Amino acid sequence: MTHSRDDFVVAETDARVLHASSMRLGLMRAVGEAGGRVAWVSPAESSLTLGMLRAMRGTGGRWIVRDAAGLRFAGTGVRLDSLDEAFAGPRSATATAPTSDTDLGIVRTLFSVRIRHEPTASLLLGASVELLPGVLGRVPTGWGTSEPAQVDWNRRKLTEFLRSRVPAPTQLYVAGEVLSATMNVRRGNGALLEETHLLLQGDVSPREAELALRKLEREATVTSALVSVDRGRRDLTVGSGSLVVPRPVVSVSTGELAEQADNGSTRVSRFGASGSGRVLTRFERADADSGPAAARLGWQSWSEDAE
């Protein structure tokens, strides 16, 4: 059910899990083309897939839930008096303690990676999605332009599809056993740019994450990356309760070794060929400060409300 406001649309649903379905993606696209945004309203028990979360964030949408006390922004304790406030700034007087998500039982790893490809005839896209899950013994099984991703995973066919869409940027959704990912491909200056956000069940060590990224670098140029670990739902969705702050594991960013310094909590090494101007930082302790690395990369927590 949808309701129109002056500059946004309210879409209400009782779905237990909100996927990036073709219908929801179509609504966000149509509203966006008209200059508006979508506020999604669901019960507090609902959750979002990684694909839906990124689609919502990419179009400037909001997620609002109904609970016993009324309306609030998902992931926060910020209350709304009415849906007319869906895109208004939060007021401190309306903020209450956020509820806790009831399913925080498993450790999950998120790879957020940007890579650059030379547009050769032999190029195969999808390297991040295929190579990185191997660190935890996972493999992708399907892809599609919406969820559920039902086309059998095949990098050659995926590449043929994406080449047919160039120069238009294309967003894809990928599924696998305890694996969820989004993949965006667009044309850059003399290259194809691929951005992947990959969520896996399981915990990866700094050393394992480093080896996986260095393996990926042999196939493409990793321009930036951030690997983090959090605790969350077993179905790899995000609930509407208070969010767990991810623990950084590894980052790849621009920089020079002379500007960096190892200490007890981080270890810095050159990444890529000599003179590439990139460094890899391993956060060896859970209390390591990842703020500077995240700021350089322009990443935020995957579960934050807006990018």
Where are these regions (language model features)?
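C-terminal interaction module
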Residues: 1-141, 219, 223-307
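Acidic, serine/threonine- and glycine-rich low-complexity intrinsically disordered segments
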Residues: 120-242
